[in-house]
């Protein structure tokens, strides 16, 4: 907008602002409109002005233009002094008729393109900005109504200019909207393409997952097939090794006058089937410690172990410990009958938490005690003891429970055993390779994996009265057996099928009709046990079952201890009478909690009188598991809770201190503590030790004691490394198996003994005595 004002002296308009406005038509025609002050002329001046111009140029311009003009403002040059003075003298007489118009005129303007401004400048000469005096005089003749028209025109033009500006802005917005819409369409197309690609990728992933699952199933199927394919080779290899061992032992016959004391050890846990268990016959010892065998009444019992020699003052050693030629001839008939039953089983009837779990029933005067872990005394001062556990252990009795299946968990007891076996064999294989090896062994037909020990599939576990020489004779007789012997059915009386206190599991009884042994099929008839069949019909007036499902609390306890569920362990333990109950492999909840590293569960079980010396089928105690994991806190709690530091496993006869893993973390601390506990047993605390289990003396030089009794070690390893001379509080002395002794008493016996805790001196020397 341009603001113009008119003013000056008397009778002379002073053009200090815009004096001319050029109107540009759409046809580029230019008209000039004067904006000088309008004075009312006199009659003489009006005639003069009418002579020069008949009409006003502004009115003629409006009549000729059919479209709104475009306004261009031209600035006048500064006025000349002479012209101003002359004009002042000419118009001075007119002052009485006109007055200066000092009202400002507001003229709207707009921008003009440079090309059009240049064209306007070319069309107008340089001096076109100055009107002739005649034209100026003509402007003075405009009527007053024309001023209102000019103002209206200007208002309309301003409105048109505003609308044109708004129109241009709307067109720009429309253009931008079109561009954004096109861009949005492009993005939508791209999104659709990406969505289709995502669906294809999801479909491929789903197909790959299904393929992986099918491959896993196929791999498992291949593993199962390989298991059955490789079973025969492993069985033959084991039989050859056992045959060589039997031949070597038969060659080194021991004099019958010498008595061998078996190595003391807590026997492995075995399943006790109370329904099929029958009492074992007992033989009373005479004053000369001689026993007689009654083949007619008790065929296959433990009475057959001793010879009938009445002339001997000292009984012959157990037949499975030291073979002799006399026993071979004497028991050849019995061995043939016993060898035909490869499926009879031995179970441990002792399930008390205070008694050591054993394979044979203990009765004070019976001969089974001599087999377990006792010493024999004789008149001669010399007593020979075996140097290895294999010389005094009937290995056929160790495999009578259910199978010890291979587990792939890394925190279970079986995984701990795998690592221990790998370390004992000195192999450089990783744990994954060891697992593959164990799986291969299982596919060959083995039900468990224990190095250098036969399995239940390789030899019958019911041969309890055979000597090693008799086993050699049996193996030779099987090889030369004729085909006619294999076709004959061996019918045995029912009383001959039950050997002593041996039991047969349901799985063995169901599969003992026909069995392949060394390529020959042996058939026998087994008396079917009569059982009461429970009907499925509901009795009258009997409460209906609401259909609630209750899980076995023992299974829940074992799984919860392995998974670390303390609440479930507590609820399951409240439903059991003894938290030390084990499964068919001898594994307790304490074993699982230690192998999984759940310290709170271990403490809870120990505080609830869990047996800290419970052994599984391989003789592993919870202390062996903790030592194999190098877990010093758990080792310390088990030792202070009454754990036997001198307990040995059955597979490799290693104590807990020998189970520490050298390549794992925490080896130094665990080894240092266990070495101190091992060496301090019987030395520290004035030589006091505590019985973990009760023991009945089988010979005169042995000492009987109960679980929890306090004993004082007088002398170590004088007669045998595994037998110590101890004294009770009442003054009785005798030989005690050291594997029954603990450095600390169990929690349930501490109040009775008034026990005071003490700390172990941690020695720098880790050598175990």
UniProtKB/Swiss-Prot annotation:
InterPro entries: Ankyrin_rpt (IPR002110), Ankyrin_rpt-contain_sf (IPR036770), ASPP1/2 (IPR047163), SH3-like_dom_sf (IPR036028), SH3_domain (IPR001452). Disruption phenotype: RNAi-mediated knockdown results in an increase in number of apoptotic germ cells. Double RNAi-mediated knockdown together with cep-1 abrogates this increased number of apoptotic germ cells. Residues 275-284, 339-353 have a biased composition (Low complexity). GO terms for cellular component: cytoplasm; nucleus. Residues 69-88, 265-396, 451-518 are annotated as: Disordered. Pfam families: Ank_2 (PF12796), SH3_1 (PF00018). It is found in: Nucleus. Gene3D superfamilies: Ankyrin repeat-containing domain. It comes from the Eukaryota. ANK repeats lie at residues 585-617, 618-652. Residues 285-295 have a biased composition (Basic and acidic residues). Its main location: nucleus. GO terms for molecular function: p53 binding. SMART domains: ANK, SH3. GO terms for biological process: apoptotic process; negative regulation of apoptotic process. Residues 354-378, 453-467, 474-491 have a biased composition (Polar residues). Residues 684-746 form the SH3 domain. Keywords: ANK repeat, Apoptosis, Nucleus, Proto-oncogene, Repeat, SH3 domain. Interacts with cep-1/p53; the interaction inhibits pro-apoptotic activity of cep-1. Negetively regulates apoptosis via its interaction with cep-1. Belongs to the iASPP family. This is Apoptotic enhancer 1 protein. The gene is ape-1.
């Amino acid at each position: 907008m341009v603001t113009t004002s008119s003013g000056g002296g008397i009778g002379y308009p002073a053009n200090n602002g815009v004096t001319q406005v050029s109107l540009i038509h759409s046809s580029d025609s230019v008209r000039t409109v004067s904006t000088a002050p309008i004075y009312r002329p006199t009659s003489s001046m009006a005639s003069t002005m009418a002579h020069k111009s008949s009409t006003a140029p502004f009115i003629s311009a409006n009549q000729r233009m059919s479209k709104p003009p475009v306004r261009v403002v031209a600035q006048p040059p500064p006025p000349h002094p002479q012209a101003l003075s002359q004009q002042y003298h000419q118009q001075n007489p007119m002052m009485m008729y006109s007055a200066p118009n000092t009202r400002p005129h507001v003229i709207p303007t707009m921008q003009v393109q440079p090309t059009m401004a240049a064209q306007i400048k070319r069309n107008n000469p340089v001096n076109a900005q100055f009107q002739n005096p005649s034209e100026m005089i003509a402007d003075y003749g405009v009527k007053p109504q024309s001023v209102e028209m000019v103002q209206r025109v200007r208002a309309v033009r301003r409105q048109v200019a505003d609308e044109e500006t708004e129109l241009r802005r709307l067109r720009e917005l429309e253009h931008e909207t079109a561009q954004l819409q096109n861009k949005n369409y492009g993005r939508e197309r791209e999104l659709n393409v990406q969505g289709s690609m995502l669906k294809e990728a999801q479909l491929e992933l789903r197909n790959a997952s299904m393929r992986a699952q099918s491959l896993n199933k196929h791999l498992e199927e291949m593993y199962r097939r390989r298991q059955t394919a490789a079973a025969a080779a492993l069985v033959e290899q084991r039989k050859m090794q056992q045959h060589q061992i039997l031949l070597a032992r038969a060659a080194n016959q021991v004099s019958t006058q010498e008595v061998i004391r078996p190595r003391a050890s807590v026997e492995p846990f075995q399943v006790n089937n109370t329904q099929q268990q029958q009492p074992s016959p007992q033989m009373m010892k005479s004053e000369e410690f001689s026993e007689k065998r009654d083949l007619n009444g008790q065929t296959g019992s433990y009475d057959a172990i001793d010879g009938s020699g009445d002339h001997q003052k000292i009984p012959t050693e157990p037949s499975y410990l030291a073979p002799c030629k006399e026993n071979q001839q004497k028991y050849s008939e019995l061995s043939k009958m016993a060898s035909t039953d490869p499926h009879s089983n031995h179970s441990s009837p002792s399930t008390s938490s205070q008694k050591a779990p054993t394979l044979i029933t203990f009765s004070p005067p019976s001969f089974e005690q001599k087999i377990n872990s006792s010493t024999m005394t004789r008149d001669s001062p010399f007593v020979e003891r075996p140097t290895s556990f294999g010389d005094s252990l009937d290995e056929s009795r160790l495999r009578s429970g259910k199978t010890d299946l291979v587990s792939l968990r890394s925190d279970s007891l079986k995984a701990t055993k795998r690592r221990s076996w790998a370390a004992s064999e000195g192999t450089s294989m990783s744990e994954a390779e060891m697992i593959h090896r164990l799986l291969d062994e299982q596919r060959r037909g083995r039900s468990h994996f224990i190095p250098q020990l036969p399995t239940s599939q390789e030899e019958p576990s019911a041969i309890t009265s055979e000597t090693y020489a008799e086993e050699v004779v049996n193996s030779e007789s099987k090889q030369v057996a004729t085909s006619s012997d294999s076709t004959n059915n061996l019918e045995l009386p029912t009383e001959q099928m039950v050997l002593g206190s041996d039991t047969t599991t349901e799985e063995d009884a169901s599969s003992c009709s026909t069995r392949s042994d060394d390529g020959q099929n042996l058939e026998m008839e087994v008396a079917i046990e009569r059982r009461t069949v429970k009907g499925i019909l509901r009795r009258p007036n009997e409460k209906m079952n609401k259909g609630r499902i209750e899980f076995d609390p023992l299974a829940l306890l074992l799984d919860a201890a392995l998974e670390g569920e303390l609440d479930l362990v507590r609820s399951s333990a409240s439903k059991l009478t003894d938290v030390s109950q084990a499964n068919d492999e001898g594994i307790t909840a304490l074993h699982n909690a230690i192998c999984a590293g759940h310290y709170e569960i271990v403490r809870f079980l120990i505080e609830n009188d869990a047996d800290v010396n419970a052994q599984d089928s391989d003789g592993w105690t919870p202390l062996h598991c903790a030592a194999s994991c190098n877990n010093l806190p758990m080792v310390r709690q088990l030792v202070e809770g009454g754990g036997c530091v001198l307990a040995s496993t059955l597979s490799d006869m290693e104590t807990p201190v020998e189970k520490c893993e050298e390549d794992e973390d925490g080896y130094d601390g665990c080894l240092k503590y266990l070495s101190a506990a091992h060496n301090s047993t019987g030395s520290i605390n004035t030589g006091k030790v505590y019985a973990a289990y009760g023991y009945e003396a089988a010979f005169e030089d042995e000492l009987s004691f109960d679980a929890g009794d306090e004993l004082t070690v007088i002398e170590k390893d004088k007669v045998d490394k595994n037998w110590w001379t101890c004294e009770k509080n009442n003054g009785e002395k005798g030989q005690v198996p050291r594997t029954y002794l603990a450095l600390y008493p169990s929690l349930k016996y501490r109040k009775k003994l008034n026990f005071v805790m003490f700390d172990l001196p941690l020695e720098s020397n880790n050598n175990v005595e």
